[in-house]
Amino acid sequence: MGKIIGIDLGTTNSCVAVMEGKETKVIPNAEGARTTPSIVAYADDGEVLVGDSAKRQAVTNPENTLFAIKRLIGRRADDAVVEKDKDMVSYKIIAADNGDAWVQVGDKKLSPQEVSARTLMKMKKTAEDYLGHEVTEAVITVPAYFNDSQRQATKDAGKIAGLEVKRIINEPTAAALAYGMDKVKADSKIAVYDLGGGTFDISIIEVADLDGEKQVEVLSTNGDTFLGGEDFDNVIVDYIATEFKKDQNVDLKLDKLALQRVREAAEKAKIELSSREQTDINLPYVTADATGPKHLNMKITRAKFESLIEGLVQRSIDPCKTALKDAGLSASEIDDVILVGGSTRVPMVQAAVKEFFGKEPRKDVNPDEAVAMGAAIQGGVLSGDVNDVLLLDVTPLSLGIETMGGVMTKLIEKNTTIPTRKSQTFSTAEDNQSAVTIHVLQGEREVSSGNKSLGQFNLDEIPPAPRGTPQIEVTFDIDANGILNVSAKDKATNKEQHITIQASSGLSEDEIEAMVKDAEAHAAEDAKLKELVEARNQADAMVHGTKKLLDEQGEGVEAAEKEAIEKAIADLEEAIKGDDKAVIDEKTQALATASQKLAEKAYAQPGAEAGAEQQGSANNADDDIVDAEFEEVNDDKK
């Protein structure tokens, strides 16, 4: 059985980790960073950029650079939070045929699952490069407060990326798992405050030691799936745009290019103000009007920043109160508070958490990496590499069906440990009713319309009978991923209907399959592009080396030979400008052949001398090498 990797698919950044023996290893990406921006860009030539390369070109390609896509996953286009987001992003958010929130890049319509799959592919490739073999299985984390549609959509993104998602686990639970392995004492109650780029979760977790086995049990969870660092950025962007409009009478929000530059500056300002009292925002030539170019120059103090985000920080405290109440605990009964997510680096956030829980939050957990590490540990549990950990997670929201009068009847209460199964018997509302519609809901409101509709299905061919006589057993079954299966059975006929909830929205199996094939096709394109780049690099090196040799040894070269070499160089330089790898390879070989005699002349005599000299050095140096290096290091340190 291969390794099951752990992926933290974040709103702003993503991270991948794997279990190596008993240790958890966070895997750096190809650029050497331990986290990767969750940004996907579509270039004019069809190339798809992911991570740092996508982030670097965002200012010059704002409409085709997609960020914070996780906030759209599993959501409807007409959701109030999505409507609000449309004004804050530089790309186009559209409604799909089924009403889901999708994005448009050029004339191409993309689901958030497809875009997220790009980031997952990058994480998969990062792990494969490190492990040296193909990776097909993963544990992916989601915010604890994600509903069923959002969980299913995340699983679909994994499938499109070529991964079998062995488990979906909640981010705070994953962080507690990483923390609980070595830092927590037995029988502790911990609060995981997880404020990431786009989502907020609070989980109250009990870690117990049962005969040498760590049991990590979630007592309650709560949160807000549209609250995070992106919102901190947005209020700074709003402030900058408002002040600039007052000063220059130009609305930066109408200029996509300017808006992207302001967004980058806002993110930098937020980060700087976590360690400094004041920051400067300098954006020359940010925009222009009839009077000429406009420059943005502004100072933001930490006090101003805190006044802008105060309402957002306070929004995170109400879920904390609810989570404690649901767990039947007071703040004083919490042994440790763990901060997870990059946004917890903001001093005001840390102060608010300290004030609410009455204790200093722990700082010995890396807020960017803990979630991926916990996912890797869960991967180790599933593959059998880790056998001393038991994870008991919960469902974040109540589940039920709509009954007479538009009321929601709950079958499974929120914070129920999963997996779980619950059945309840219902009946008909009319005489001789031959069919019933089972409308599945998720949420805490008594009125059906106030909750999230997960989907509906019909149970028909019910034998005629007076109202209230037929007995229809409805069963809710939640798996370990928090994904729901619902069945309804007429007890008289044993006729049964059941569905895995995919909501009224979501992707069909055919759509997912098409996206998987599309992703595979792109993988082949990406491989071809990589081969082309490598061929160009090799050709460039050949041109540079040959020109250098001609400069150094040109006097001793016959005119005809020199002319042939120069023609071969010109041909290869022309080939490099094109996109045909075969032509580049052919012209590279032609230059190698044309310059063979020149290379032989250049390296014959000096090469022999250099070899002899090198041999002599090796003989003389002997054991002194270690001492010499040791002395040199000490000199540097003095």
From Swiss-Prot:
The lineage of its organism: Bacteria, Pseudomonadati, Pseudomonadota, Gammaproteobacteria, Thiotrichales. Residues 603-618 have a biased composition (Low complexity). Induction: By stress conditions e.g. heat shock. Residues 603-638 are annotated as: Disordered. Belongs to the heat shock protein 70 family. Keywords: ATP-binding, Chaperone, Nucleotide-binding, Phosphoprotein, Stress response. SUPFAM superfamilies: Actin-like ATPase domain (SSF53067), Heat shock protein 70kD (HSP70), C-terminal subdomain (SSF100934), Heat shock protein 70kD (HSP70), peptide-binding domain (SSF100920). The gene is dnaK. NCBIfam families: PRK00290.1, PRK05183.1, prok_dnaK. InterPro entries: ATPase_NBD, Chaperone_DnaK, Heat_shock_70_CS, HSP70_C_sf, HSP70_peptide-bd_sf, Hsp_70_fam. Residues 621-638 have a biased composition (Acidic residues). The modification Phosphothreonine is found at T199. Gene3D superfamilies: 1.20.1270.10, 3.30.420.40, Actin, Chain A, domain 4 (3.90.640.10), Substrate Binding Domain Of DNAk, Chain A, domain 1 (2.60.34.10). It holds the Pfam family HSP70. Acts as a chaperone. It comes from the Bacteria. This is Chaperone protein DnaK. One of its GO terms (molecular function) is ATP binding.
